[in-house]
Regions:
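Secretory targeting and sorting signals
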Residues: 1-28
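Conserved catalytic neighborhood of penicillin-recognizing serine enzymes
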Residues: 124-177, 189
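A short glycine/serine-rich beta->alpha loop
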Residues: 99-106, 179-183
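Short alpha-helical patches at coil-to-helix transitions and adjacent helical residues
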Residues: 111-114, 144, 148, 187-194
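Active-site SXXK
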Residues: 93, 104-129, 142, 279
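Amphipathic alpha-helical segments within well-ordered protein domains
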Residues: 121, 151, 194-198
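Glycine/charged-rich beta-loop-alpha catalytic/anionic-binding loops adjacent to active sites
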Residues: 93-103, 174-175
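Penicillin-recognizing serine hydrolase domain
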Residues: 4-5, 27-90, 156-312
């Protein structure tokens, strides 16, 4: 009987001890990530990072050139006797422009000098030759200073009329006409002018080896609209390039053409080539016979009207 009582007493004591241990075990489990979870507030460094992110301005997109929904909304200023423009979106290959972009023509003037350079370089490469340093200096002057005498020299050396005929056939121009033995009087539509620009950009004109050199040289045209010194030193850095947002200027190559005709006024063409687009503006207008300020402002205006800032 005494043994049974002792066993019962021991059993009761053990049960009591186990009941006392349960709350302690639960506390340890909670501390190890059990059902009871306590989240501590973020530390000072994390809170600072979150505040910095929240204070950042919303991202913005850079301005760009784009075709307008209504091409007819791009209008010339009063006084122009001819006005046409065309815009090629390189992402789609679509050309849009003025109603006369495929029918109205202007004399190409110095705009065609980039082709004269490209044609010479491509043909030289095809014959396994390399231009001399003197030739490259000539071609550079022809583009950045719009040197007429050098243009005439290379035009004649490469075949005269054949130079422009190759321009038409290689660049797929459909409404451009050769003026016999006179490169500056080549008649070209705005639509063909952007095709010509694309031909320069995609390597067809100068070939793979010399296209980067040509486009880079066209980014360094010198002289403002008032810098018309002589036929060998003419300022051609004006027009479309002056109407572009600053972010687009470094990647844009240009070649303008301009001549004043007694009785007919200025014949002016502006060509700009960017990796995303090609734009040309053609205009005839009366004005100062020395400085083509009025037509230059027309080209500038078209570029500004085509500039948009995308929305996020």
């Amino acid at each position: 009987m005494r043994l049974r009582v002792a066993l019962v007493a021991s059993l009761v004591a053990a049960m009591a001890a186990s009941l006392l241990l349960v709350p302690a075990a639960r506390g340890k489990l909670a501390a190890l990530g059990g059902h009871e979870h306590v989240t501590s507030p973020p530390g000072p460094a994390l809170a600072k990072d979150r505040a910095a992110i929240a204070s950042r301005p919303a991202p913005t997109l850079l301005p760009m050139l784009a075709a307008p929904a209504d091409p007819a909304s791009i209008k010339p200023p009063v006084g122009t006797t001819f006005f046409g423009w065309a815009f090629l979106d390189e992402s789609t290959g679509v050309i849009i422009g003025s109603a006369n972009m495929a029918t109205g023509t202007n004399t190409s003037e110095s705009m065609v000098k980039a082709w004269i350079a490209a044609d010479y370089l491509r043909r030289l490469t095809q014959h396994g030759a390399t231009p001399t340093d003197a030739a490259l200096r000539d071609l550079t002057k022809m583009i950045i200073h719009s040197n007429d005498d050098i243009a005439e020299t290379y035009y004649e050396a490469d075949g005269g009329n054949a130079v422009i005929q190759r321009l038409i056939s290689m660049c797929g121009l459909t409404d451009t006409k050769v003026f016999p033995y006179w490169w500056s009087k080549t008649a070209m539509t705005p639509q063909d002018a952007v095709r010509y620009g694309q031909c320069l950009a995609n390597g067809t004109a100068a070939g793979e080896k010399w296209t980067p050199w040509l486009l880079d040289t066209m980014k360094h045209v010198e002289g403002g609209v008032k810098d018309q010194i002589s036929v060998t030193m003419q300022g051609g850095h004006w027009g479309i390039i002056d109407g572009l947002p600053p972010s687009l200027v470094p990647d844009t190559s240009i070649k303008n053409g301009w001549t004043y005709y007694a009785g007919d006024g200025w014949h002016v063409n502006c060509l700009a080539i960017n990796p995303a687009w090609v734009l040309t503006v053609m205009v005839r207008v009366q004005g100062n016979s020395i400085v083509p300020s009025v037509p230059a402002s027309v080209c500038q205006s078209v570029a500004r009207q085509l500039t948009i800032t995308p929305e996020i």
